Amino acid sequence: MSKKGRSKGEKPEMETDAVQMANEELRAKLTSIQIEFQQEKSKVGKLRERLQEAKLEREQEQRRHTAYISELKAKLHEEKTKELQALREGLIRQHEQEAARTAKIKEGELQRLQATLNVLRDGAADKVKTALLTEAREEARRAFDGERLRLQQEILELKAARKQAEEALSNCMQADKTKAADLRAAYQAHQDEVHRIKRECERDIRRLMDEIKGKDRVILALEKELGVQAGQTQKLLLQKEALDEQLVQVKEAERHHSSPKRELPPGIGDMVELMGVQDQHMDERDVRRFQLKIAELNSVIRKLEDRNTLLADERNELLKRSRETEVQLKPLVEKNKRMNKKNEDLLQSIQRMEEKIKNLTRENVEMKEKLSAQASLKRHTSLNDLSLTRDEQEIEFLRLQVLEQQHVIDDLSLERERLLRSKRHRGKSLKPPKKHVVETFFGFDEESVDSETLSETSYNTDRTDRTPATPEEDLDDATAREEADLRFCQLTREYQALQRAYALLQEQVGGTLDAEREARTREQLQADLLRCQAKIEDLEKLLVEKGQDSKWVEEKQLLIRTNQDLLEKIYRLEMEENQLKNEMQDAKDQNELLEFRVLELEVRDSICCKLSNGADILFEPKLKFM
């Protein structure tokens, strides 16, 4: 009997050893998975540091390029100012020399005329008068010829100087174009490098996120196994209670049957004793087995309590991080409000532009009707020359007005199209996202929805299996879930606001208006240059046909002034171009910062959602035993 009892007592010990080994293996797997998760977190941190380093390098390169460009522009400005100063000094010297020459000529003429007057007063003869007249005519002709030759030489010199200035300007423009092309190529290469680094980082982040998702699935499977083991322990506890009740009933039966033992016959008493001994051995074995199972269940409960404390600490850390993110997102919310105000201002300006376009189209139609009426009157009526000239002048004036209004209408229509395009683009960017799909920087993430649905189903199944918990724990779970949902909704709303702000920045810093403005200024400068060339040709013709004119000095000064005005316009345009380039660069930098911020928010949001789902699932086995 003792050997049989030992063999039967060793079997539950072997079972307990197997269960302990399985629990130790599960614990080792969980620790290894936690270690790998920490390693992945460190890898993600290293990737962020690498992104920060790349960003710092890019900013340094941009600063270096801007410094180099500013130095080149300063050198060009100095060279241009030196050339303009030299031209100004040469023109001033020429003007002083011409003034001195004209003063000398006038003094000589005055002296000669004074001498002739003196001779006439003295009463000279007619021969003297004729001789003096011939001499005066010859001197005037010689002076006129010399002045004409001098003016022709000056015109040739001015033409040569103009050609040199045009060549220098063309050389400067070509140098600027080559430098701009080099800078564009360097900028494009830098942008390609940045995009390549971004793609590599995105690939690494996706790979890490996939690994984290796989590890989350493994953790979920292990937690399900723990839930199954907890259910088995509950069943064992129920079996233990049933066996305890059976033991109590057996003891009561033994007590009840012990009094009539003497009245039974001796054979029957021996049989009863044998049965009692066997029952005692069975009770002892059952008690030992139940004690071992109770010890195992107590150890499992301790492990689950430790796990619960760890998860509570992680939950507190996540709550702290969520509060920090809320504090960081406050300026973005304010920026969103400012962008909404700008949007309202743009809509009001669009309405004003539409009203202006309507008024201008009405005026244009009226002008066309007037022109058609005047043309019909001109066909059917014959007036004198004065009326014809007046009609032609009025027609020219009206035609110029119509052209100006047509230009204004074209500008307003272009601006209206641009604003409508921006409005459509903004409307497309403001479309609501679909349910169960999260729009991220990498695309549409549907696995997060699967993880959420899995967490909800596991939560519901565990709630059906477990015993009813206290109302305080239910309230805590409900509040935590509501907080997580609110955070997720807030993050998605802020992401959409950031997308809207980015679209507005792109529209505000677009290059169409700058290109149109440059084209207009270029056309205006070409028109001014053609006008100046026509003036120069007219002056040459006048000097050749009529001789010396009294207005050539004034026209020369006007040409010098127009040249200076053109140079000032070129300088202003260059300054505006530099300012626009700087604004474009600032807008691009701000855009990249917003993209990086959105990426960080998406990664943090996905990690918080997954950790919150995991925390809910991991809390459930603990709640089963409460």
From Swiss-Prot:
The modification Phosphoserine is found at S382. Residues 365-626 are annotated as: Mediates interaction with TYK2 and GABBR1. The keyword Calcium does not apply. GO terms for molecular function: GABA receptor binding; kinase binding; microtubule binding; RNA binding. Transmembrane segments: none annotated. Its main location: cytoplasm. The keyword Disulfide bond does not apply. Residues 19-255, 284-413, 490-604 form a coiled coil. Residues 1-22, 452-477 are annotated as: Disordered. Predominantly expressed in neural tissues and lymphoid cells (at protein level). Isoform 2, isoform 3 and isoform 4 are specifically expressed in brain and retina. Isoform 1 and isoform 5 are also detected in liver, lung and skeletal muscle. Also detected in testis and to a lower extent spleen and intestine. It is a peripheral membrane protein. InterPro entries: JAKMIP (IPR024836), JAKMIP_C (IPR031994). Residues 452-461 have a biased composition (Polar residues). Residues 1-365 are annotated as: Mediates association with microtubules. Keywords: Coiled coil, Cytoplasm, Cytoskeleton, Membrane, Microtubule, Phosphoprotein, Protein transport, Transport. GO terms for biological process: cognition; protein transport. Pfam families: JAKMIP_CC3. It is found in: Cytoplasm, Cytoskeleton; Membrane. Signal peptide: none annotated. Belongs to the JAKMIP family. Homodimer. Forms a complex with GABBR1 and KIF5B/kinesin-1. Interacts with JAK1 and TYK2. This is Janus kinase and microtubule-interacting protein 1. The lineage of its organism: Eukaryota, Metazoa, Chordata, Craniata, Vertebrata. The gene is JAKMIP1.
